[in-house]
């Protein structure tokens, strides 16, 4: 049966748009079906980390996103008296991904940057007002019925990706269940436009007050956000009332400094799909997992999904890699994702304590940890890939490969491009890579390795002898070296394989 596209993506949010761009960059024909008639204009996600920015860099949107975002140096947890419990410091510094660790964003601006980038690829089309309905996977591809403003359409694709949010119709139709991780708390979110920034906190804050746990964070594009926990006995209608919201904001003394743009009640949940793949149907973003917002990793997790999935889909569709390559998607992402959710739950339980004595015990425990020097000063890193497409016994396999930044501001990825890299010590004098050689050499020294093979999603396939790495990669993927990206200059021929 003739295909209309290689990949049909249900959902035109950050995950779906990023995946579409990364696929189009690799030569695939992509259709994005977004059910809403127009882009959602109000804020939602507020944070992207360094790894998320690196993924947006490959998608051609990072500079635009960076220009509209804000940096914040501290993330403070305060008790009911305003005393410091815990501080994550220096989160505005450059992280391993080559961008600041914390970037406070305005989601509509992020999506606008991604839509502009998508327009550069004629084989990638975003359709608003297209709602995915039923679909049939016959093993060779997926036939999907879509409701459009012009009437029903049928789209034939090799793969269907459900990036259609927490209520994902694709997930439901595929019969995929959620594993509930036992965190469910209702909160009121209040987003404001800022007229006088000097009257607002300069740090991100978690107010661990048992009377009313509260979050206060910066956002991009001249905005700020408060989140107030909804207490037992309160209703969504009650807490959304203008007068009630005004009483919540009164202690912050921001009257006249801000204007309310949006208020909404959300239930913060922790859930993960028990399967991320059902034949030629795969899930990504909130359709596959939901993370409480306390670690700021909701959007970031969806971007990681897109980065992991894009190169594998392209390898299968375009380069003849085995379909089983896609079976590595969930094992690789799920462990990292569970660690992300666990951290968010831990932070959430610390913040969401509403029992006075429980809060006192928490404060004492944190205080003792600070005295003993056992208190972290930044969020812990996420685990390496432990199973999947890696040489498991190889040093540093599955770890995240950093992106050095040259003295002139050039980033490694922009020089070497997309695809798989084979970096060895004897290549570090090549002109394109010379500005980054000291950082790469230190990385190899620390791991006592002669070479590293870096996957297209910038995770380490393995370290060791260059010839052995190349052979192992070809055996694992069944890809010919030429299929992993043609060299763009003679000096790069041995780097990009």
Residues covered by each model-derived region:
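N-terminal Rossmann-fold NAD(P) dinucleotide-binding loop
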Residues: 16-17
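Conserved FAD-binding catalytic core of PHBH/FMO-like flavoproteins
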Residues: 116, 159, 163-268
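Active-site-adjacent segment of FAD-dependent monooxygenases/related oxidoreductases
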Residues: 44, 49-117
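Helical substrate-recognition/capping region of FAD-dependent monooxygenase/halogenase enzymes
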Residues: 1-6, 10, 26, 35, ...
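Core beta-strand elements of the Rossmann-like FAD/NAD(P) dinucleotide-binding domain
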Residues: 3-5, 150-159
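Glycine-rich FAD pyrophosphate-binding loop
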Residues: 24-44
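FAD/FMN-dependent oxidoreductases across multiple families
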Residues: 237-301, 321, 326, 343, ...
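A conserved short coil-to-beta-strand element within the FAD-binding core of flavoproteins
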Residues: 128-142
């Amino acid at each position: 049966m003739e295909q209309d596209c290689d990949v049909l993506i249900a959902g035109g949010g950050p995950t779906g748009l990023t995946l579409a761009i990364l696929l189009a960059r690799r030569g695939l024909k992509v259709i994005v079906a977004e059910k809403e008639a127009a882009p959602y204009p109000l804020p939602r996600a507020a944070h992207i980390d360094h790894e998320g920015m690196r993924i947006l860099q490959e998608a051609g949107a990072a500079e635009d996103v960076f220009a509209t975002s804000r940096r914040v140096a501290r993330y403070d947890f305060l008790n009911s008296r305003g005393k410091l419990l815990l501080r994550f410091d220096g989160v505005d510094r450059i992280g391993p991904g080559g961008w600041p660790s914390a970037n406070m964003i305005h989601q509509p601006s992020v999506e606008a940057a991604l839509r502009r980038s998508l327009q550069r690829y004629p084989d990638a089309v975003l359709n608003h007002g297209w709602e995915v309905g039923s679909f049939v996977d016959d093993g060779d591809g997926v036939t999907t019925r879509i409701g459009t403003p012009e009437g029903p359409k049928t789209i034939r694709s090799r793969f269907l990706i459900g990036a259609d949010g927490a209520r994902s119709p694709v997930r439901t139709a595929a019969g995929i269940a959620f594993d509930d991780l036992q965190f469910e708390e209702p909160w009121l979110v209040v987003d404001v436009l800022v007229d006088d920034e000097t009257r607002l906190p300069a740090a991100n804050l978690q107010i661990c007050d048992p009377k009313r746990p509260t979050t206060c964070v910066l956002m991009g594009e001249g905005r700020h956000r408060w989140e107030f926990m909804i207490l037992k006995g309160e209703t969504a209608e009650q807490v959304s009332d203008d007068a009630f919201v005004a009483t919540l904001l009164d202690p912050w003394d921001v009257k006249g400094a801000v204007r309310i743009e949006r208020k909404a009640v959300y239930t913060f949940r922790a859930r993960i799909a028990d399967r991320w793949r059902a034949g030629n149907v795969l899930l990504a973003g909130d359709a596959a997992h939901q993370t409480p917002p306390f670690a700021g990793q909701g959007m970031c997790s969806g971007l990681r999904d897109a980065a992991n999935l894009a190169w594998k889909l392209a390898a299968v569709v375009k380069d003849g890699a085995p379909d089983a390559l896609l079976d590595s998607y969930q094992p690789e992402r799920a462990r990292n994702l569970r660690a992300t959710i666990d951290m968010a739950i831990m932070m959430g339980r610390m913040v969401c304590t509403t029992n006075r004595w429980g809060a006192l015990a928490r404060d004492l425990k944190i205080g003792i940890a600070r005295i003993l020097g056992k208190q972290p000063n930044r969020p812990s890193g996420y685990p390496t890939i432990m199973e999947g497409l890696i040489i498991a016994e190889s040093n540093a396999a599955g770890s995240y490969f950093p992106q050095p930044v040259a003295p002139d501001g050039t980033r490694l990825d922009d020089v070497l491009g997309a695809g798989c890299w084979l970096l060895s010590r004897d290549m570090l004098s090549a002109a394109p890579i010379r500005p980054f050689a000291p950082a790469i050499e230190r990385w190899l020294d620390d791991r006592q390795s002669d070479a590293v093979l870096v996957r297209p999603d910038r995770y380490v396939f393995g370290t060791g002898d260059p010839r052995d790495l190349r052979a192992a990669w070809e055996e694992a993927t069944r890809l010919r070296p030429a299929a992993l990206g043609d060299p763009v200059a003679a000096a790069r021929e041995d780097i990009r394989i």
